[in-house]
């Protein structure tokens, strides 16, 4: 299936890729009015980033850096240079500008979803997000997209794929609400009960390219005839998933909309809580104690992403909205580690950056919100080769008009994107 999907993606974006790729070995100097050092929080005026062989050679004030002779200069004017951004919760195969209604997905096959995912990946990169973590895509479409992008037959961000989401029978991730025998699922498709079958489910995802495991520990907004706040999986089952993933050097993200499920998942050792729409003092204390990240997805909860969805989904969304904002406020105030994630696919692809302002509305500073999408996200992924504009790191660089520390909405207007030294977007 993965090979068929990659072949289907092959014609896409080739012309754009050839048009934007620089000559190999050519040194490039990016020059802008400002550069944000996300580690120190300092804005450096009249700044340059020197790029060679896909990596950052130097970054800082122009006066302190000797540009290589013969380098190509890119003049970006009144803009701020930043590291490429991360979105830690995306579903590339669903959603998008032409594919957003719940009922449309019922009639799509995996190739339809993969082609849709290719366009969503392009939109995501053009918005300045050079790395994304998949929160699950059926048929290993996220794995196929990762391969297609790495091979140069599609344009998009660096993808950390998850494969199928891990769910209990009847849980969020299973197909609920249908007659017996319709849309039945297997451990290979992520639906499993008990340690033995969960081992099979986790190992199968990793075998076929998953680099993170997504575990559903509560109900979800899209579940038919199932409550959202039910605890899914026993403690033993959660520990089985976490232990097996960790044995394979793979991290675990846990979808959770209930307080009870969050507490159990954190105690089981997951690396991040996704959504976390119901938290209390005990939950934030435990998350701080264990070093568990929160990926809060306020873009999903505070927008109108579900306006065209069935009534049962809108009702659950209203339930989540009533408590999600206060939970995020509590987490920010308590100092829980937060990484940036939008649930793009339910929230719109390519509009990921609108979430920065929402995080600021919940008490984060603009710098803290940017760090959530750079340094913190890189830490959660466990990668040390990106997330800042440091010499030796991958040349993933974006630029925005103006100063994002003064106006966080500037991040919604990325107009320069470089990934691995290749320029994919430039100001007109």
Q: Residues of each region from the PLM?
A:
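C-terminal cap of metal-dependent C-N hydrolases
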Residues: 44, 373-375, 391-428
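Histidine-rich, glycine-flanked metal-binding segment
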Residues: 35, 40-82
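Histidine/acidic-residue-rich catalytic or RNA/ligand-binding cores of hydrolases
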Residues: 96-99, 223-225, 262-268, 298-312, ...
């Amino acid at each position: 299936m993965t090979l068929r999907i990659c072949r289907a993606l092959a014609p896409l974006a080739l012309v754009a890729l050839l048009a934007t790729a620089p000559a190999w070995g050519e040194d490039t100097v990016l020059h802008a009015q400002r550069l944000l050092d996300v580690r120190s929080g300092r804005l450096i005026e009249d700044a340059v980033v020197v790029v060679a062989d896909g990596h950052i050679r130097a970054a800082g004030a122009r006066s302190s850096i000797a540009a290589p002779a013969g380098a190509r200069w890119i003049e970006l004017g009144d803009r701020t240079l930043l590291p490429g951004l991360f979105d830690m919760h995306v579903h590339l195969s669903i959603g998008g500008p032409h594919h957003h209604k719940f009922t449309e997905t019922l009639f799509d096959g995996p190739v339809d979803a993969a082609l849709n995912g290719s366009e969503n990946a392009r939109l995501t990169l053009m918005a300045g997000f050079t790395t994304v973590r998949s929160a699950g895509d059926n048929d290993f479409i996220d794995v196929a997209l990762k391969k297609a992008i790495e091979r140069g037959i599609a344009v998009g961000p660096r993808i950390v794929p998850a494969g199928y989401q891990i769910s209990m029978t009847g849980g969020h991730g299973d197909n609920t609400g249908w007659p017996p025998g319709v849309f039945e699922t297997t451990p290979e498709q992520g639906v499993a009960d008990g340690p033995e079958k969960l081992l099979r489910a986790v190992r199968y995802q990793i075998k076929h390219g998953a680099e993170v495991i997504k575990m559903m520990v509560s109900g979800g907004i899209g579940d038919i005839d199932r409550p959202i706040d039910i605890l899914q999986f026993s403690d033993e089952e959660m520990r089985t998933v976490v232990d097996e993933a960790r044995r394979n050097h793979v991290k675990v993200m846990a979808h959770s909309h209930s307080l009870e499920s969050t507490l159990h998942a954190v105690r089981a050792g997951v690396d991040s809580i996704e959504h976390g729409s119901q938290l209390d003092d005990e939950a934030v204390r435990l998350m701080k104690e264990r070093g568990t990240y929160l990926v809060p997805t306020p873009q999903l909860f505070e927008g109108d992403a579900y306006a065209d969805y069935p009534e049962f989904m809108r009702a659950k969304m209203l339930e989540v909205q009533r408590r999600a904002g206060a939970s995020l406020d509590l987490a920010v105030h308590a100092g829980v580690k937060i990484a940036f994630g939008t649930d793009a696919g339910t929230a719109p692809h390519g509009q990921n950056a609108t979430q920065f302002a929402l995080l600021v509305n919940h008490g984060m500073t603009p710098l803290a919100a940017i760090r959530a999408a750079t340094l913190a996200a890189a830490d959660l992924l466990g990668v040390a080769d990106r997330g800042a504009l440091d010499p030796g790191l991958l040349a993933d660089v974006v630029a925005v008009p103006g100063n994002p520390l003064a106006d966080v909405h500037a991040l919604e207007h990325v107009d320069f994107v470089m990934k691995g030294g290749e320029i994919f977007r430039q100001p007109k």
